[in-house]
Amino acid sequence: MSISQGVIRVPRGVQTAAGVLLTAGLVLAAAGAVVLPRWLGPRTASTPAGLETQADDAERLWRQAVGIVARARGVSTGEALIGSEWTPLVTTLGEAEAKRVSMSPAWPRALVREFHGAGLRRGDVVAASFSGSFPGINLAVMSAAEAMGLSLAAVSSVTSSSWGASDPGFTWPEMEARLVAAGALRKATVAVSAGGDGDRALDLDGDGQSRAREIAARCAGQLGARLIDPADFEEAIRARLDAFDEARAGRPLAAFVNVGGTEAALGRSPAILKVQNGWLGKAPFDSSPGRGLVARMVEQGVPVLHILHVRGLAVRWGIL
């Protein structure tokens, strides 16, 4: 399945079931609905010690990173992480407005608050799935994690929806490699894939496929990360779980953050269309063979933060 802001591409074989669920999913997304898990409990007016300092640090890291990308591209900071509508690496439609929303410096601050609310503390291991669709939010997750002293292990994909990290030379893994080389942020990515259909960009034409896979291989080398080039969907899932297992080195996963709509994260089952944005509940919602990382992490009892329909979440978190 491939999903971007405002557009959901339903995987082959589930179109009939998805027809009913799609409407409900879009209504929930438009409303910005979110389910807070039981472990968060009620929010209070108290501020954890150091939260605002960490939020300031996260915003500073984010702004510094955006500035580096802006200078490299020769554009303003407001346009630094917004790519072209169509390139050989674009797999799905997206909305330019949603990409602009994702460029707010309030995202790293909001994520520090959310991570504190979920009980995350220095040294905790957080797994993540980053597509190329929302590089601004990928950076926000990285900045918040670094400011809080979290150990972040991400699997990053090359392909993007339109207006995301869609330009060759400035795909998401290339951006991260540039920022890590500049010393702006600690490396987060532990594995890189081409993304798209089959996790091998099979929904692109021949030129797009070869470019995506070349970028994935090159960035994996630059970042000292695994290259994921799976034979099938199940192998794409296993490769990610193996990468997370290696990164956590026996420590428990404190949370899983999904940004964007990669097939491996969302899966091929229509059950994902019922999932709301934000922190997910603890009850498993999909047991099908086609379930993705989001469903499997919930199943394993790992707190999951799902960031896909960004405008609704931005309203709920006070970003808009």
Name the predicted role of every residue range.
Residues 106, 113-118, 122-171:
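Membrane-embedded segments
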Residues 132-136, 159-163, 196-199, 262-265, ...:
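Solvent-exposed loop/turn segments at secondary-structure junctions
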Residues 169-252, 256:
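A substrate-binding/cap region within the structured catalytic cores of diverse enzymes
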Residues 253-255, 262-320:
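C-terminal functional extensions of proteins
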Residues 17-36:
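Hydrophobic membrane-insertion alpha-helices, especially the h-region
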Residues 50-106:
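N-terminal, Lys/Arg-enriched amphipathic/low-complexity engagement segments
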Residues 37-53:
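Ser/Thr/Pro/Gly-rich low-complexity linker/stalk segments immediately outside membranes or between
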Residues 1-12:
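N-terminal Lys/Arg-rich, disordered targeting/topogenic segments
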